Amino acid sequence: MSQALKNLLTLLNLEKIEEGLFRGQSEDLGLRQVFGGQVVGQALYAAKETVPEERLVHSFHSYFLRPGDSKKPIIYDVETLRDGNSFSARRVAAIQNGKPIFYMTASFQAPEAGFEHQKTMPSAPAPDGLPSETQIAQSLAHLLPPVLKDKFICDRPLEVRPVEFHNPLKGHVAEPHRQVWIRANGSVPDDLRVHQYLLGYASDLNFLPVALQPHGIGFLEPGIQIATIDHSMWFHRPFNLNEWLLYSVESTSASSARGFVRGEFYTQDGVLVASTVQEGVMRNHN
């Protein structure tokens, strides 16, 4: 396991304060606030700690209410909404400075047989031979602002290989579609619940910026503000984050200073394992 992956697993492994109450640390990725995927992953960890082990998260719906401070810990307060014969529901509040910054409602279910069908995986080049985002960042290190340089060129917990590179510092006009391959940078423990909250973390990577592509804007360009409003995810089938997953993302709308994106995770052999939807603020202050 790489040190970067070990650090992320430690970050997402919360300290239990008392029943239903957890504390998580924050990481600074060089962004303007706490990375949304961190809050999602930590909230999923907190929620799963309160349900029977055989019940796995199959969906969550969340709202980001305030920017999180990457220099302060976050408290996660888990409320039990229901424990039924088949499903468990939890509501999680993420709190900083005495105020909620995020709410999540998550539903859990034990594996159960039933009807099966899925969308066909879109075509995409294989990940072999594609450069990783870290390799791309290292090749562009001389162009990176000092505040971002160390964050972007360091070893990362997840290896991300874009099919087409979109420069966050200088965008180019493109169709609102993006495909990236993602896998863990090292070996994730053999526990599907761990893989699920790691994928929750990963689901916020290469997501909302896709809505900027038709406008030729990179999300780190001066004067550009983007921030998640809500983020939802559905886990359809088991998966292994030690193996490549294709994250296929599209933006179907942008209006009223908001961008809308949706994505799908597929295994290399075409199994649809998860779906995502997000809406966020997109403003050009220039």
UniProtKB/Swiss-Prot annotation:
The keyword Hydrolase applies. InterPro entries: Acyl-CoA_hotdog, Acyl_CoA_thio, HotDog_dom_sf, TesB_ACOT8-like_N, TesB_C. It comes from the Bacteria. GO terms for biological process: acyl-CoA metabolic process; fatty acid catabolic process. Changing residue 204 to N/A: 1000-fold reduction in catalytic activity. No significant change in substrate affinity. Thioesterase that has relatively broad substrate specificity, hydrolyzing primarily medium- and long-chain acyl-CoA substrates to free fatty acids and CoA. Functions in the thioesterase-dependent pathway of beta-oxidation of oleate and conjugated linoleate ((9Z,11E)-octadecadienoate or CLA), which provides all energy and carbon precursors required for the growth of E.coli. This is Acyl-CoA thioesterase 2. It comes from Escherichia coli (strain K12).
